[in-house]
Each structure stands twice: as structure tokens, then as C-alpha cells.
Amino acid sequence: MKRNKIVSILLLVAMTFSIVLTGCGDKKTTEAPTSSPGPTTQETSATNEQSGKATRYTSKETPFVTLNGELKKYESPFYLTSVGQSADVSMLDALMKKVGAEYTYNATAKASDLKDVKTVIIATGASSKGLGAAGISAEDEKARASELLEYCKENDITVIMAHLGGVSRRGKLSDEFADMVLEYSSGIVMVEDGNDDGKFTDFASRKNIPITLINTIADCIEPLKIIVGK
């Protein structure tokens, strides 16, 4: 009898010990794991650089930003034309009218049209439809642009490049037209979406010319007022 009592006590102790161990194990499995800290600002910047995307400067709250200097008033008379014959030049024409600018507009202007002009604003961006409507080929457009740009250089006419079509005005032909104009430009105004790869900000930095980035086409109003002195 005494022996059976001892066995019962030992079994009770063993069961109690097992319950304690099980409880401890359950507690460990229900504890929330420690979360890893989020990326630091430096890590985020490094990720953006590795992804190949340029830093974003504009937003709804900051509609335009000028890098590499200040946006300023340029000398008149002004002339507005296109290289690439996209519809962007028509939108820029409407914006120029809206700010009350005094200027001459001809999307297919030739060098001979620029007599006495001091500042040329060139809307860049290729459009096969626009080229077709103008009755000219891409090669014809390049030849016209080259002649016009050389005339500007020889006669001290300031060239401002306007790239307002965003990503839709990027691509092989559009970039070829843009590259032609960039080499003669004293300033750039562009919708920032078209600079996702940093092409234009990198160029402006290398050449040390001001580039004004705008959030949307509508945000071009204030920069244009400054450029034309309105």
C-alpha cells in the first residue's frame, strides 16, 4: 500500500512537470516576433539610384523647381517653334497666349524666319502624325532643325528647350530631336515625368545650364511668366 502511494506521488509530480514545460513552450510560440527596422533615408536613396530612376523634385505642393541656377526673364522678341512636330507645341502656344506673351509662332520655322529674334523657345518631341500633317519626313525635320539651330548660334539667339510631353515624348526619334536642341540650349523647361532616367537633369548638370522641372503641363504657366517677363 505504501509502495503504491509513492508511485502515485511520482506520477503526479511527473504530470505537473510536463504541464509546466508545455505551458512554457506555448508561451514561446505565441510571442510576436521582433520586426526589422524600416530602411533609412540613405538606404532608400541608394535603392532609387540602383533602380535607375532619377530623384523626383516636383509634386502638387511643389509645382515647379529650377536646378543649376535661377529661372529668369529672357530677352525679347520671342519666337516659338517645334522640332519633331508633336502637339506639344500647340499646347505651349496656348499657354503663351494665356500668360499674355508677345511672340511669333510657326511650328515649321526656318532660319530665315528668325531675323531680329532674341529668344527661341523650341518644343521638342516626335510625332509621326504631326510630321505627316506638315508634309515632311523625320530627316527633313532634322535638316530644318540643324539649319535653324546653327543660325541661332551664329546670331547669338538664345535657345530654350521645352519638353512638355512627359514619357510619351521619349523614345528613339523623340530623343534624337531633343539631343539636337539640347546642344544649343541655354535653358530647359520640362514636365518632370519625361526625366525618369535623369537624362535631362544629367545634361543640364554637365553643361551647367538651368533646368526647370514642372509637375504637369498646367504648371508651366508661372515659369513662362518669368521667362517672358509677365
Where are these regions (language model features)?
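Bacterial N-terminal signal peptides that target proteins for export
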Residues: 1-10
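A short, gly/pro- and small-residue-rich
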Residues: 132-156, 204-211
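Short, electropositive alpha-helical surface patch
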Residues: 170-192
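Charged, low-complexity C-terminal accessory regions
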Residues: 25-28, 51-72, 194-230
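A short, well-structured beta->alpha microelement
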Residues: 96-116
